[in-house]
Amino acid sequence: MTGMKKGKNKKKNVKNDERYKELDSLISNDSEIGNNSRWGGAKRICKLIGNEMRNNIYVYLLSILYLCVSVMNKVFSKRTLNKIGNYSFVTSEVHNMICTIVFQLLYFIYRKTSNPASRNESQKNFGWQFFLISLLDASTVIITMIGLTRTTGNIQSFIMQLIIPVNMYFCFIFLGYRYHLFNYLGAFIILITIAAVETVLSYETQSDNSIIFNLIMIFALIPLSFSNMTREVVFKKHKINIIRLNAMVALFQFFTSLLVLPVYNISFLKEIYMPFSEMGTNINDGLRCLFYGQSTIVENCGVGMVKMCDQCEGAWKTFITYSFFNICDNLLVCYIIDKFSTMTYTIVSCIQGPAITIAYYFKFLAGDVVRQPRLLDFLTLFGYLLGTIIYRIGNIILEKKKMLKALNTDGSEAELTSIETSTA
């Protein structure tokens, strides 16, 4: 046994030594050429960037894929609400039905084509975990739908960046995560940027943007964060297929969305306030709008009015496109959390903020919700990118410290093993 343990320790030491020899060579090579060459610093930066990309190429490719899907998901979500924003509950429930059917079909195909060993996982019962995740997701979707009705595209992308400090706080409290000073600095820069943007916008007369609905959308980040943390805990303790997870969560979410209905009865939400007595009519009008293209609210509506004007013609095409990208988005989120962690997903998702803002500049992507570029947008993008880069630097430092600690621990174990072997 000691011989096998010693062999494993040797392999770990060799692997870690090779990686850190590569990093040390970058530093030593730079010291040789940096004194006499003005390009020494630039070469060192390029080599360090190349080393970072080479060691994490899979993560970056996955990030690009998730970025594209996530941006399209958010853009078509806004386009859907711009057409049928008066019927948020209807669109949410129909979307849940589509997700349930698609995920159940995918999981059925997976079980038929997979080996018998992987099917044993389906015998385990994760009912309460599925219910908790679905309840949190339902709360997130409903609250986000409400917030989006009076949140402009650019502000939407800005608010999504708040997920970084929100996830940091809850992961610190409940999952025991610890962070580097640069992580806190990066999150602080993002927070300051968001605060500055909201302050400027509060003095502007934007009838299609409401501070109250911005705050509602920010509040949706809390159940989203808890949902991601629950997924991480479940993935770490049990081996759950991500397709099955999404299928069961979508099924539960169809029913748990009913628990969030009282939100529509809050009187101060003037734009979407709907007493229980009018919900039946609203659901009927929403179904006719989505499936038959019949607009009901066409008078006394629009910018500055209590209700949005229905634009039901062709709304189902936009809605189906949104559902497709949302399904892909859910699968990628679960995969990233399963293979990495909640904070890895947070780092990847923070890139979508600037990307969404840019996407709203192009009419072929944003359609009727296209926005004109403003200086404030670019200043905000700079603040987000600066905060994101500093946050990533903190992660790199923490990863290096963790690997060095593991290397030292393996070295100590190897020495103890050799002593035990010699005394034996």
Swiss-Prot record:
The keyword Phosphoprotein does not apply. It is a multi-pass membrane protein. Glycans are attached at residue 86. GO terms for cellular component: vacuolar membrane. Disulfide bonds join 289-312, 301-309. One of its GO terms (biological process) is amino acid transport. It is found in: Vacuole membrane. Pfam families: CRT-like (PF08627). Nutrient transporter. Involved in maintaining the osmotic homeostasis of the digestive vacuole. This is Putative chloroquine resistance transporter. It comes from Plasmodium chabaudi. The lineage of its organism: Eukaryota, Sar, Alveolata, Apicomplexa, Aconoidasida.
